[in-house]
Swiss-Prot record:
The lineage of its organism: Eukaryota, Viridiplantae, Streptophyta, Embryophyta, Tracheophyta. One of its GO terms (biological process) is hormone-mediated signaling pathway. The gene is CUL4. Neddylated (rubylated). Deneddylated via its interaction with the COP9 signalosome (CSN) complex. It comes from Arabidopsis thaliana (Mouse-ear cress). Residues 1-43 are annotated as: Disordered. This is Cullin-4.
Length: 792
């Protein structure tokens, strides 16, 4: 584009103006105050341009070998004399009269006599000629007069609150519409005057300030509005239908005016607190806990929805907190005392989940955790301490633990603190009766691992073992469990009564993982003995002694047991039939020839046999203990024998013989008849072979009463455990003192508690220390009896 001529440049400069704001395009007015539109590049008062003296084309310069230096240019400066336009007579008064008429028409909801474009231009013209400040004040005055009158019209109205609120809403909506219309006309005022004067409010803010001012001057209107809003909200809480749109509009009015917090929120929260305080007391008395918790959950949902629909979001947190405080915090203890035990007993997982969720909202989970701990301990104590139900104790504990696990997972969301509470409480309750739970858990496992559990699959048995292992973890006296478990395992292995060898080994593997190899060393040794015994028996059958010396018609299998692995069995004398004595002697000869230097001792009380018997109604096989077999074989030579005759012939210890005869003559399978009849065997009783015995099965198991655990046997097992504990305590004391040489009583007791894995009382430890002093392993410091010295 070529440079403009001097004339065109001058024209552009003369068209410039001091105003920095542009106005909408419009036609030229009659008073000639409107200027032509400005050119965007001619706003400067001084326009400079230059001309080159040698206008040689650029192409010619490029063709030269050496470029010439730039030639100096001549600069022309043109100064402009701007003519200031003059205002027509009464311009300001006429323009304001026009605008005032329009503003009043807007407030009176009448038709405006002028088109909006001309009104906009009128405001623009006033601003252009520095009359914007006065115009702002005039508009503010008009607005104030109207707003004051509008709000005063609401004073003294004795209408229904809902009608009154509708009128307030109408007043507010009219105000908003009117202020927006006025702002659209006076937009130039907002864009220029307000921006240039930071202390001046926009027209909208000015209107809000006036509305707020005159609302405060009409306190009756504000107070009735707040009262009406609170009344409507309370009605809605009481399940009455209300106009939520009206509520929303009026609350937005309070927010827009900046009086929401002071005028509405404060009384609203106070009223909410009073409402729910009364409701909480009423419902707590009338409802059970599940219903009450559902009600609280519903109320919290309602209030949250209320905040979404019409209450300002800023109120949500204090509102929900108020509801939680009045419906939950105030009633935590009552809820727990009144309903927690019922919910736990009924396994009400959904209601417990609701309780946990609600309690977490008010930081009351610690109270819930304590209630859970108390419940577990009290309920478990009833199970453990009821001696009449010892038979069902373990199964009851398993069922109780299973239900707690379900509640923990489904209701308490696997909360770690709650899980630890259940574990700690279970450990407490299961050790309330010293040693007995450990013994019963071992017995329970014996029942499950014993052959005869029909309908139990390998998977089900494995699941039971896992669950029992959980109880085992809680036991403090694991040595008691080991003693009884080992005794029962021995019977299962020796009598061939294990339901599954794989299950037996699986359980030992679990115990090994739980307690270490030292705990299961003897149990594993028992299995090794059984496996080795099978090999020894096979080798014996192939030996020359067996082929040439064994009596015919008898098959015999021997378990060779390592004394250190197996329980201690008291020796019991018995006169065996000649055939069995021969068999034992031949086997002993074979074994000692193979394993020289060893010693065999027969435990006849553990033997069992299968006898073939001829009855008048058919042949039968009788599965009996060795003692029962010895007694029955006497009747091959006599039809009737007295108690004394049998005792002399067998040499069985008196109590054991009475139990044996009782099982043969007084039990379900009566292969002997006792005279006189009765449940107990007395001196002088006579026994004869029951030739008329009949049974549907060919092989019959005669319950061996003497093989059932007696009170004496239980006591003996427990005493052995206590004796072993004393040895362990003595060894621990000597081990510690040998390392420390000198130690105080308090520190010694502390270290013993750390090292010993079974429960022990300080008084018992003191007795063991005294015993070691008597045996000269330790001595007291002469100057201080509380100090012990180790004696090498």
């Amino acid at each position: 584009m070529s440079l403009p001529t001097k004339r065109s440049t001058f024209s552009a400069a003369s068209a410039s103006d001091d105003s920095s704001y542009s106005s909408p395009p419009m036609k030229k007015a009659k008073n000639d105050l409107h200027h032509s539109p400005q050119h965007p590049n001619t706003a400067d008062k001084v326009v400079g341009f230059h001309m080159e003296e040698d206008p040689t084309p650029a192409a010619a310069n490029l063709s030269r070998k050496k470029a010439t230096l730039p030639q100096p240019t001549k600069k022309f400066v043109i100064k402009l004399n701007k003519a200031k336009p003059t205002l027509p007579t009464n311009f300001e008064e006429n323009t304001w009269e026009k605008l005032q008429s329009a503003i009043r028409a807007i407030f009176l909801k009448k038709k405006i006599s002028f088109d909006l474009e001309s009104l906009y231009q009128a405001v623009d013209n006033l601003c252009l000629h520095k009359l914007d400040g006065k115009l702002y004040d005039q508009i503010e005055k008009e607005c104030e007069e109207h707003i004051s009158a509008a709000l005063q019209s609401l004073v003294g109205q004795n209408t229904d609150l809902t009608v009154f609120l509708s009128r307030v809403e109408k007043c507010w909506q009219d105000f908003c519409d009117q202020m927006l219309m006025i702002r659209s006309i006076a937009l130039t005022l907002d864009r220029k005057y307000v921006i240039q004067n930071p202390n001046v409010r926009s027209l909208w803010e000015m209107g809000l300030q006036l509305f707020r001012k005159h609302l405060s001057l009409a306190p009756e209107v504000e107070q009735r509005t707040v009262k009406g809003l609170l009344s409507m909200i309370e009605k809605e809480r009481l399940a009455e239908a209300v106009n939520r749109t009206l509520l929303s509009h009026l609350l937005k009015m309070f927010t827009a005016l900046g009086i929401y917090m002071e005028s509405f929120e404060k009384p609203f929260l106070e009223g909410t607190s009073e409402f729910y305080a009364a409701e909480g007391m009423k419902y707590m008395q009338q409802s059970d806990v599940p219903e009450y918790l559902k009600h609280v959950e519903g109320r919290l949902h309602e209030e949250n929805e209320r905040c979404i629909l019409y209450i300002d979001a800023v109120t949500r947190k204090p509102l929900i907190t108020t509801v939680e405080r009045q419906l939950l915090e105030r009633h935590i203890l009552v809820v727990l005392e009144k309903g927690f035990t019922t919910l736990m007993d009924g396994r009400r997982t959904e209601d417990l989940q609701r309780m946990q969720t609600l309690f977490s909202r008010v930081n009351a989970l610690e109270s819930l955790r304590q209630a859970l701990s108390s419940y577990v301990r009290k309920t478990g104590q009833k199970i453990v301490m009821d001696e009449e139900k010892d038979k069902d104790m373990v199964q009851s504990l398993l069922d109780f633990k299973a239900s707690l696990d379900i509640i923990w997972e489904e209701s308490f969301y696997k909360n770690e603190s709650f899980g630890n509470t259940i574990k700690d409480s279970f450990e407490h309750l299961i050790n309330l009766r010293q040693n007995r739970p450990a013994e019963l858990i071992a017995k329970f496992l014996d029942e499950k691992l014993r052959a005869g559990n029909k309908g139990t699959s390998e998977e089900e048995l494995e699941s039971v073992l896992e669950k029992v292992l959980v109880l085992f973890r809680f036991i403090q006296g694991k040595d008691v469990f080991e003693a009884f478990y080992k005794k029962d395992l021995a019977k299962r292995l020796l009598l061939g009564k294990s339901a599954s060898i794989d299950a037996e080994k699986s359980m030992i593997s679990k115990l090994k993982t739980e307690c270490g190899s030292q705990f299961t060393n003897k149990l594993e040794g028992m299995f090794k003995d059984i496996e080795l015994s099978k090999e020894i028996n096979e080798s014996f059958k192939q030996s020359s002694q067996a082929r040439t010396k064994l009596p015919s018609g008898i098959e015999m299998s021997v378990h060779v047991l390592t004394t250190g692995y197996w329980p201690t069995y008291p020796p019991m004398d018995v006169k065996l039939p000649h055939e069995l004595n021969v068999y034992q002697d031949i086997f002993k000869e074979f074994y000692l020839s193979k394993y020289s230097g060893r010693r065999l001792m027969w435990q006849n009380s553990l033997g069992h046999c299968v006898l073939k018997a001829d009855f008048s109604k058919g042949k039968k096989e009788l599965a009996v203990s060795l003692f029962q077999a010895v007694v029955l074989m006497l009747f091959n030579d006599a039809m009737k024998l007295s108690f004394e005759d049998i005792k002399d012939s067998t040499s069985i210890e008196d109590k054991e013989l009475r139990r044996t005869l009782q099982s043969l003559a007084c039990g379900k399978v009566r292969v002997l008849q006792k005279n006189p009849k009765g449940r107990d065997v007395e001196d002088g009783d006579e026994f004869e072979f029951n030739d008329e015995f009949a049974a549907p099965l060919y092989r019959i198991k005669v319950n061996a009463i003497q093989m059932k655990e007696t009170v004496e046997e239980n006591t003996s097992t427990t005493e052995r455990v206590f004796q072993d504990r004393q040895y362990q305590i003595d060894a621990a004391i000597v081990r510690i003192m040998k390392t420390r040489k000198v130690l105080s009583h308090t520190l010694l007791i502390t270290e013993l508690f750390q090292q010993l894995k079974f429960p022990i009382k300080p008084a018992d430890l003191k007795k063991r220390i005294e015993s070691l002093i008597d045996r000269e392993y330790l001595e007291r410091e002469k100057s201080n009896p509380q100090i012990y010295n180790y004696l090498a």
